Each structure stands twice: as C-alpha cells, then as structure tokens.
C-alpha cells in the first residue's frame, strides 16, 4: 500500500470516527451559522440565552450597549463621534450604531460564523437601516426571536437579578443562582445588582419597552422571520424552544 493510500484510509477512518462520535453525542453538531436578533424586555432572559447561542453557533454576541461602551473606551473613530454626542446629552444616531455593528461584523473574528444582535434595533428606522446594511453585505437576518413574558412575573424576576458587569452574564437569587453566593461562575469575580433593578424604575422601563417594541415585532412578523418563545419557563426549556425556532432539534 502506498503512502497516498494510507493517507486516504486514515482520512476516511477519522471521518467515520467523527460521524460515530456525533451520533453518540460526544461531539456537538455545530450548525453552519446564525444571523439573528434577540428581542425581549429587561429580565426576560436575554443575558442567559445569548451566551448559550454564542457558544452553540460559534458566533458573536453583539449587545449594543456593551459594544458602544467598548468603542468609546477604545477611542475608535465611531467611538469618539458617539462620545461627543453623548457628552452633549444627545442620542447616538442610528447611522453610527449601524456602522458600529458593520465594523464588528467586518473586524471581529467571532462574527465570521454569524451574529446574535441584542438591544438593537429598537425602532422601525433602525430595523430598516440594519436590513439595508446586512443585505449590502449579503448577510441578511435569518431570524428575530422574541422572549415573551408577563410584566408582573418580570418584576419578581428582576428585583432578584444579579449581573457580572464585564461579560453581561446574569443570574437570579432564586431562579438561577450562581454556584457561589454573589460570585460569577466563570471568572470568580463579584456580581452586582443594578441600581435600576427596582420595581418603580422597572415599570417605567417596561412601558417604554412595549411602546418601542410592538412596532418592531410587527415589522419582523411582516418580513416572516419572527418567532415567539414563552420566557416564563425554566431557562433549559426556553433554550430548547429557541433552538426549535432556529431549526435545531
């Protein structure tokens, strides 16, 4: 048997082993890509589910608030422009936000297999600008998944919420506690409770959220990419429902 024949035999054996390991559940079957928007009110579980999606699809998680802070801290051209507007008490324009997302998609290696957008778009003009940019890159959105939950349950959830500021990972004192009290499971760093995670502040945020989000949901329903998931369920059930929406059983 020649060296070339041996190489071919080894390659075939490796492929067969991988196939058997996948069937046995030893190697996860990594999907090709994901391009999605995650919609949901504060406390619906986006901070729990987005890292799961990122890991499952080997994609980037673009939480627009974190992205904006990172660009400002790194003093990128867009970050400098955004800081100037924020320092004057203004709102960062849709164009700057869409360009920041575009910059991440072009320069962040994690985005090569797709992206999970979280916190954007919040208005119809933002959704239209985002669609236009993504279509020009030939990477249109495939899915908009909405985490749906009753406001009263949200209030109960959020008043016990704990957050790891650096990563955005979130926990709950009752429903999803960290392994060690007030400590992030991954880094061992301390967790915090956000100052705006109180009942009055939350109710105001929810009024704003519903006003902003209903048109966005209608927009994605019209384009045919919207799916709703009951976010009042246990995180593991929410996760399996999200995967079903994405065609993963």
Swiss-Prot record:
It holds the Pfam family ADK_lid. Residues 160-197 are annotated as: LID. GO terms for cellular component: cytoplasm; cytosol; mitochondrial intermembrane space; mitochondrion. It catalyses: AMP + ATP = 2 ADP. CDD domains: ADK. Its main location: cytoplasm. GO terms for biological process: ADP biosynthetic process; AMP metabolic process; ATP metabolic process; DNA replication initiation; pre-replicative complex assembly. SUPFAM superfamilies: P-loop containing nucleoside triphosphate hydrolases. AMP binds at residues 64, 69, 90-92, 119-122, 126, 194, 205. Its EC number is 2.7.4.3. Residues 63-92 are annotated as: NMP. InterPro entries: Adenyl_kin_sub, Adenylat/UMP-CMP_kin, Adenylat_kinase_CS, Adenylate_kinase_lid-dom, AK2, P-loop_NTPase. ATP binds at residues 43-48, 161, 170-171, 233. Keywords: ATP-binding, Cytoplasm, Kinase, Mitochondrion, Nucleotide-binding, Transferase. Consists of three domains, a large central CORE domain and two small peripheral domains, NMPbind and LID, which undergo movements during catalysis. The LID domain closes over the site of phosphoryl transfer upon ATP binding. Assembling and dissambling the active center during each catalytic cycle provides an effective means to prevent ATP hydrolysis. Belongs to the adenylate kinase family. AK2 subfamily. HAMAP family: Adenylate_kinase_Adk, Adenylate_kinase_AK2. Monomer. This is Adenylate kinase. It comes from Candida albicans (strain SC5314 / ATCC MYA-2876) (Yeast).
């Amino acid at each position: 048997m020649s060296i070339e024949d041996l190489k071919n035999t080894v390659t075939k054996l490796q492929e067969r082993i991988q196939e058997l390991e996948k069937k046995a559940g030893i190697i996860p079957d990594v999907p090709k890509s994901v391009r999605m928007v995650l919609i949901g009110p504060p406390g619906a579980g986006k901070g729990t589910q987005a890292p799961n999606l990122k890991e499952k699809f080997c994609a980037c998680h673009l939480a627009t608030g974190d992205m904006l802070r990172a660009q400002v801290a790194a003093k990128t051209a867009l970050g400098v422009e955004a800081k100037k507007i924020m320092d004057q008490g203004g709102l960062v324009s849709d164009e700057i936000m869409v360009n920041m997302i575009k910059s991440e998609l072009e320069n962040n290696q994690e985005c090569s297999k797709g992206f999970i957008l979280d916190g954007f778009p919040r208005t119809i003009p933002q959704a239209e600008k985002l669609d236009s940019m993504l279509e020009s890159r030939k990477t249109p959105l495939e899915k908009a998944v909405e985490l749906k939950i009753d406001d009263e349950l949200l209030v109960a959830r959020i008043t016990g919420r704990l957050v790891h500021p650096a990563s955005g990972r979130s926990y709950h004192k009752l429903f999803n506690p960290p392994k060690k009290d007030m400590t992030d499971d991954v880094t061992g760093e301390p967790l915090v409770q956000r100052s705006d995670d109180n009942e009055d502040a939350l109710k105001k945020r929810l009024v704003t959220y519903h006003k902003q989000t209903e048109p966005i949901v209608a927009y994605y329903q019209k384009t045919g990419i919207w799916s709703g998931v009951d976010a009042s369920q246990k995180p593991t059930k929410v996760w399996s429902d999200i995967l079903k929406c994405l065609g993963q059983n």
